């Protein structure tokens, strides 16, 4: 499956860049989210599963920015891989969540 080139978080479009960004190599992390301008960087040299966890990690930061939950970095570090694992191990759940429900009035 093709990696996403952008994601929507609330009303904002965030380009997703998978690159060996020199700015990231100087930091102790593998990804970054910027809210002005909107952009998510994911370290391209990470293996594919780690890239997915990194992107989900940055998305959680983006959601937190939008709805002001106040998640700590430690909480995001624990939530991202747990959520990724939940979604990957339950494809029927993911399919059901993504379906348009039959609306009856």
Model-derived features: where do they sit?
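Active-site recognition of the HExxH zinc-binding catalytic motif
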Residues: 53-65
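Metalloprotease/metallohydrolase-associated module, dominated by Zn2+-dependent proteases
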Residues: 1-49, 66-105
